[in-house]
């Protein structure tokens, strides 16, 4: 599982519309970790 790459991707995607939804999920994973 590429968590590092996913985290960075979430930050960038968070700016996008669809990315915003994905970003939220990523944030939850980061907090859970």
Swiss-Prot record:
InterPro entries: Natr_peptide, Natr_peptide_CS. GO terms for biological process: regulation of blood pressure; vasodilation. Transmembrane segments: none annotated. It comes from the Eukaryota. It is found in: Secreted. The keyword Nucleotide-binding does not apply. Keywords: Disulfide bond, Hypotensive agent, Secreted, Toxin, Vasoactive, Vasodilator. One of its GO terms (molecular function) is hormone activity. PROSITE patterns: NATRIURETIC_PEPTIDE. Disulfide bonds join 10-26. Pfam families: ANP. Its main location: secreted. GO terms for cellular component: extracellular region. Expressed by the venom gland. Belongs to the natriuretic peptide family. Snake venom natriuretic peptide that shows an increase in perfusion pressure, urinary flow and glomerular filtration rate. Reduces total and proximal tubular transport of sodium. In the aortic ring assay, causes a relaxant effect in endothelium-intact thoracic aortic rings precontracted with phenylephrine in the presence and absence of isatin, a natriuretic receptor antagonist. This is Natriuretic peptide NP2. It comes from Crotalus durissus cascavella.
